[in-house]
């Protein structure tokens, strides 16, 4: 039927190509939660210093802070950070949280260990999903104490102040 004349061939071509175009429109794009998620952490100890690699996803692509983020919800001290690594020591068989909070000080210390401002890598294009690895250089990560085993519980927070899952790394021997 498609081989008889030019008019029929055009109709046949349309009928044959229509399913191809419809299938292309049905390609599913990955959908992730708009709440950020930590998917893994790798910790590399190099003596006094260490590096923490935090693997994460964010479905709406709004994880990260800009330098100008200091007003509104970001004016509260705790919201000025977006990666929190809480420090715990194993003391006499129990994990004890060693609170190091920059917001407890009337003049917050910008260099407080374990709270970080991760810059915003704005996604471009239609797919706004962020899927990446954050590299954190931990200088002097070993707090002086009588105990030698520690762990971190890490979480990230996006621009909507949505907190990720808490991800535990450790035990680590100092």
Regions found by a protein language model. Name each.
Residues 1-9:
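N-terminal secretory signal peptides that target proteins for export/translocation
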Residues 22-25:
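C-terminal motif of bacterial Sec signal peptides marking the signal peptidase cleavage site
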Residues 27-174:
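Non-catalytic macromolecular-recognition regions in eukaryotic signaling proteins
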Residues 10-16:
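Sec-dependent signal peptide recognition
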Residues 3, 16-18:
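Leucine-biased recognition of intrinsically disordered, low-complexity hydrophobic segments
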